[in-house]
């Protein structure tokens, strides 16, 4: 499994960034770069076979291959194992996931592997509402999701212990500068919410 981290600077916090169907692309690398000023070490493991990275125009192929392997459940298990492997070196292990990476983060949050999680527009969380995170979890949705009702899902999560939901008036992918749905304003707002929720400081 491919993995990248910054050189350790004596930080006691690790942040794992979980990728979308495309793998560790420029968006995920950009997220890692944004985290550099914070007091943490950043990891961007690749969970696709052979560390492959798909271009955005290959979305259909990327989706087809992802559903074949590792799939959401498989990525969730691999992510939990990866996070557990960091515990020997870090007091806190946090996870930030996007899209399928967000749903995988949601699954991992129910295993005790992470100490805090942020899930950016994990649309398939709706298929795993039986999960009870064992650590604080912020679930950020785009208001405009064509495949499901965001209010219906947030209503199911509102009384869930340790779970906070946040909805932005945007479309799926609004935090990705390379997406046609990118919103600089709401991306900045969501990022501020995420770092505060995880207790990350500069």
Where are these regions (language model features)?
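Acidic catalytic loop of the alpha/beta-hydrolase fold
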Residues: 143-148, 156
């Amino acid at each position: 499994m491919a993995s990248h981290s910054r050189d350790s600077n004596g930080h006691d916090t690790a942040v794992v960034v979980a990728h979308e169907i495309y793998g560790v692309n420029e968006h995920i690398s950009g997220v890692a770069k944004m985290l550099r000023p914070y007091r943490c070490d950043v990891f961007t493991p690749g969970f696709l076979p052979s560390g492959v990275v798909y271009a955005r125009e290959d979305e259909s192929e990327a989706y087809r291959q992802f559903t074949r392997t590792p799939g959401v459940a498989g990525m969730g298990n691999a992510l939990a194992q990866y996070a557990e492997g960091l515990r020997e070196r870090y007091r806190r292990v946090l996870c930030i996931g996007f899209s399928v990476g967000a749903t995988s983060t949601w699954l991992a949050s129910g295993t005790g592997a992470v100490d805090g999680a942020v899930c950016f527009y994990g649309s398939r969380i709706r298929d795993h509402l039986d999960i009870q995170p064992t650590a604080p979890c912020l679930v950020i949705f785009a208001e405009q999701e064509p495949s499901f009702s965001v209010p219906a899902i947030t209503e199911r999560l509102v009384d869930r212990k340790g779970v906070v939901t946040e909805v932005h008036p945007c479309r799926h992918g609004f935090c990705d500068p390379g997406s046609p749905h990118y919103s600089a304003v709401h991306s900045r707002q969501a990022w501020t919410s995420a770092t505060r929720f995880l207790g990350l400081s500069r």
